[in-house]
């Protein structure tokens, strides 16, 4: 046993220090980025935000809506091959360019992903997702996926430390998914005692990944547009959002009514709700590591997307970054004990 005494920070622990700027308007900020990925060799351009691969966020409807904002969607892994075929037949080439195919690490998951990718060559992204990316089996699966799909861009996770980030990139991942426990409906940290403050995880993993020519996506912990800006400021190439995109018309959650008001269910993918729905319940040897919440219906996701992108543009103007690419170089974090004046928050 040992104790590391280095301070680790989350998004709530910092603010971004403003700097002189020559920008006249938020409209001068370019949020689109262009990436060429290390292993696949593919080039992609767009706004580097990803809707999370949760079945109450990463839906086909969400992909259709967010493609209009140049945003990616990691479509959840519980759609059947037949449902994928129907979606692909109706979706435009531009929508498919903004879609990630999500998979687990079982043999059945692999075979299903092979079938989905064979439906259309425009499906260029694969998201290999497990809660704990530190297992040897996971690393071997990433290597197997890279061998099977040499020209597909592979996103794999989740991990929170530099050495494992490097391991996944060397095994074939183009993008490493960073985050253990920060999600709004994740209870891993309280159930297991395991985790890592998200901002520090992003900073450390970005440093490791970029040294090898890889990239990272910050997954979890964003509760407002300012957190998205902080993630990019900390070095994230992409930011994945779950809770911020839940509760919308396109989110796919079940709608319940209480006292005449409608709510949408949103749950973590390791929650009892998710396991009851997809695997017939919580196995005897494990505990649920997620919760279920009821969110007021929030209307079309486009309104939220505009709010997030507007906040991101504004953050860039405050530090003089004319392009999102420059935000990291222009960011200085200051440690704080408060984020906002909360006097009227209860009203």
UniProtKB/Swiss-Prot annotation:
Binding-site residues, K(+): 181, 183
GO biological process: purine nucleotide metabolic process
SMART domains per the UniProt record, alphabetical: IMPDH
Keyword NADP: yes
Binding-site positions, NADP(+): 108-131, 216-239
EC number(s) reported in the record: 1.7.1.7
Active site: residue positions: 186 (thioimidate intermediate)
Role played: Catalyzes the irreversible NADPH-dependent deamination of GMP to IMP. It functions in the conversion of nucleobase, nucleoside and nucleotide derivatives of G to A nucleotides, and in maintaining the intracellular balance of A and G nucleotides.
Name by which UniProt lists this protein: GMP reductase
Species of provenance: Salmonella gallinarum (strain 287/91 / NCTC 13346)
